[in-house]
Amino acid sequence: MKSIAIVGSGISGLFLANLLEKNTSFSYKIFEKKPSLDLSDGYGIQLSVNSINLLNKIGFQTMNASEVFFPKKVNFFDAKVLEKICDIDLSQFNFENNRYTTLKRSKLIEFLLSNIPKDKIIFNSDLINIEEYEKLKLSFSDNTKEEFDYIVAADGVYSRTKEILFKKEGTPKYFNSIALRGNIQNFENSDISLYLGSNFHFVIYPINQNNEFNFISIVRKKLVESEITNRSLFKDKRVR
C-alpha cells in the first residue's frame, strides 16, 4: 500500500482525502498547520456543474437541502443606473443531479470533514523540510518526522510545500485589485446578480434556503511597494 501526505486541509486537500477513503490502494494523512478549522458561518462559494459532478461522487447530493441553493440565472446590471443588461440561463448547463450550486464555504468544509476519520488530520503541523530518499521524509516544526511515498501540496496560495520542493519563495503577484466580502440578510433576489461599474464590480447571490446572501466586490486599487510586500494585508480580515 502506497502512502500519501496531504499538506493542507482546504477544499482540495479534503476532497482528495474523500476519494482516498474509497481507494484501498493508498493510505494517507492530512497535515494542517492551524490548530483547528474555522467552521463558523462564513462567506459563500459558487460551484459549477463540473464541480458538483465530482462532489456527487463522494455523496454531496445527500447534503441537507436547506443548506444549498440552486440559482437559475446570472443577471447582469449596470451598477450606476441599476438597469439590467442581460442574463445567462444557468439551468441549461445542468444535467441529472448536477446543478449549479451556491452555499456557505463552511458547510462544504463540514461535509468534506464528515467522511474523514479524525485521526487522519494532524493539526499544528508546520512543514519545514522535505528530504527525498527511497521515500519522502517530511520534517515539522515540532521535531516530528514522517515518511511517505507521495506528497500533495494543498496548502494554498502561500504554499510552504511548493517553496520547499522548488527551493523558491512564493511571491504573490498583485493585479491592482482588492476584494471586499460580506453577508446580507433578506435580499429580494433568487438569482446571482452581477453589477458592473467603472473600475469595480460586485456580486450578490443566495447561499441557502434561509434568505442569506453572499456579497463580494472587486475594486481596482493601486498599492505602494511596502503594502504589496506586507503579507498581512492579504489575509482574510473580518469586520463585524
Map each language-model feature to its residues.
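Beta1/beta-strand and adjacent pyrophosphate-binding region of the FAD-binding site
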Residues: M1-S12
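Conserved N-terminal helical subregion
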Residues: K2-I4, E21, S48-F166, G170-N183, ...
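Residues at the starts of beta-strands that form the adenosine-phosphate
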Residues: S3, F26-K29, E212-F215
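Short beta-strand/turn micro-motifs composed of small residues
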Residues: G8, E32, D78, V219
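Conserved Rossmann-like nucleotide-cofactor binding loop
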Residues: S12, S36, Y158
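Glycine-rich FAD pyrophosphate-binding loop
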Residues: L19-D41
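Conserved N-terminal glycine-rich FAD pyrophosphate-binding loop of Rossmann-like flavoproteins
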Residues: S36-L54
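Active-site substrate-recognition segment that forms the wall
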Residues: D191-E225
